[in-house]
Amino acid sequence: PYEKIGAELVKEVAKKTDDVAGDGTTTATVLAQALVKEGLRNVAAGANPLSLKRGIEKAVEKVTETLLKSAKEVETKDQIAATAAISAGDQSIGDLIAEAMDKVGNEGVITVEESNTFGL
């Protein structure tokens, strides 16, 4: 029963991360798994679950604050290309994404689909 709850939690974390950020699901899944594993270990060792929850919430608050302070606005086509290239692990993909974003603008939508066409 606990394993199923933990698995559902991790699945929800990955889905929410993908919905909000579109990237980082692996990192979010690994972090969620570690939190569940260590949380259960601490509770089994006698830790107060509510105190543990409050501690996790404080840690999340601090991490969020630190990430927001270090975040940089990505505005220019070159910045978008560089950021997308890092995310995709490929400069040519980064350039394509930047070009697409430049064409549709800030409010536009870009849909990427897998093609079954070989060689095109």
Curated annotation (Swiss-Prot):
Catalytic reactions of this protein: ATP + H2O + a folded polypeptide = ADP + phosphate + an unfolded polypeptide
**Can you tell me where the transmembrane regions are?**
none
Can you list the GO cellular component terms from the UniProt entry?
Answer: cytoplasm
Has UniProt tagged this entry with the keyword Isomerase? yes
Q: Its Gene Ontology molecular function terms?
A: ATP binding; ATP-dependent protein folding chaperone; isomerase activity
Q: What is its EC number?
A: 5.6.1.7
Where mainly located? Answer: cytoplasm
Protein's GO biological process: protein refolding
Gene3D superfamilies documented for this protein: GroEL-like equatorial domain, TCP-1-like chaperonin intermediate domain
Instruction: Name the source's superkingdom.
Output: Bacteria
Tell me which UniProt keywords the record has, alphabetically: ATP-binding, Chaperone, Cytoplasm, Isomerase, Nucleotide-binding, Stress response
What binding partners and quaternary form does the record give?
A: Forms a cylinder of 14 subunits composed of two heptameric rings stacked back-to-back. Interacts with the co-chaperonin GroES.
| Reported function | Together with its co-chaperonin GroES, plays an essential role in assisting protein folding. The GroEL-GroES system forms a nano-cage that allows encapsulation of the non-native substrate proteins and provides a physical environment optimized to promote and accelerate protein folding.
Q: What is this protein called?
A: Chaperonin GroEL
